[in-house]
């Protein structure tokens, strides 16, 4: 069986185009590890960049993108189950999988094989938390994580009160229903990190935000609202969907939306890197390569690290 290659990195680091270039070179298929790219119709705001999967005259097979409806709430448990179905199918065909994304919790959960279970809604707990601020909810979540010895629910993933309440709900359930934390098989993988210096990352984030707005991100979100998706359900997804929705429904001006969203994405990228460095402290070996190296050089470096013959 061919060992999986994992490519991780912060937003705007070019990890998807790198994964696609590598896949074209070694005849691999890509499994996405992005908590928002699972939603159909949320293309510009989540940065799917589907053109990246076109390499020359072929399209690299990709998985776990556009698999559920916007307005629904896809979760880590579902991702784990879906990942294993796809992963097992790929390796059974003798093909090498490449796991690629920036959602560190998704990546870590499948590599480590964390035991998860579907967590039911706890309406009494939700009612109790409804009036608390995001700061208060975050403090409660950190306390629960400490008591659970949990690495789940990094601040990257709880940037709205609704998401924080769901995270508290899950951690509370897990505290009351402990499980064996290794019931799923861990996945052996070579892990590649795409490192991009802070100044270049900030420049690319701002450039990409402007580009997405020019490409029609506001209209994309208007169309989702016109389809009957409640604003709070889009705000739940955070970042672009939070700030642009607030602009579309008249809560902020365009200029304020852009300013706040730009800051939020920069903060998000920083938190992603914090998560990846935390993975190293938790025992993962990540081979870092420079995002600014030429594509051919990056592909060659990965092949060398993974001991893949040219």
Region locations from a protein language model:
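Phosphate/pyrophosphate-binding catalytic cores of soluble transferases and nucleic-acid-acting enzymes
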Residues: 1-310
């Amino acid at each position: 069986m061919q060992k999986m290659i994992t490519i991780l990195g912060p937003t705007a680091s070019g990890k998807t185009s790198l994964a696609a270039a590598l896949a074209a070179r070694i005849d691999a298929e890509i499994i996405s590890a992005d908590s928002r790219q699972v939603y159909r119709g949320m293309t510009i705001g989540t940065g799917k960049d589907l053109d990246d999967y076109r390499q020359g005259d072929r399209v690299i097979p990709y998985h776990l993108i556009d698999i559920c409806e916007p307005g629904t709430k896809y979760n880590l448990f579902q991702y784990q189950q879906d990942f294993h179905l796809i992963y097992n199918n790929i390796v059974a065909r003798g093909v090498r999988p490449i796991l690629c994304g920036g959602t560190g919790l998704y990546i870590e959960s499948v590599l480590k094989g964390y035991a998860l279970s579907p967590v039911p809604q706890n309406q009494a707990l939700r009612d109790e938390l409804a009036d608390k601020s995001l700061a208060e909810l975050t403090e409660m979540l950190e306390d629960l994580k400490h008591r659970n010895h949990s690495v789940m629910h990094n601040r990257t993933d709880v940037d709205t009160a609704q998401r924080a309440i769901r995270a508290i709900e899950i951690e509370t359930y897990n505290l009351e229903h402990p499980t064996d934390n290794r019931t799923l098989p861990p996945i052996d993988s070579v892990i590649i990190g795409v490192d991009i210096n802070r100044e270049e990352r900030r420049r690319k984030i701002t450039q990409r935000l402007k580009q997405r707005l020019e490409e029609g991100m506001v209209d994309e979100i208007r169309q989702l609202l016109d389809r009957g998706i409640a604003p709070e359900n889009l705000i739940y997804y955070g970042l672009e969907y939070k700030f642009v929705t607030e602009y579309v429904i008249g809560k902020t001006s365009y200029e304020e939306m852009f300013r706040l969203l730009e800051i939020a994405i920069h903060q998000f990228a920083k938190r992603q890197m914090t998560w990846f460095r935390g993975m190293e402290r938790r025992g993962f070996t990540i081979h870092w390569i420079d995002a600014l190296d030429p594509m051919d050089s990056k592909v060659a470096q990965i092949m060398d690290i993974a001991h893949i013959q040219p």
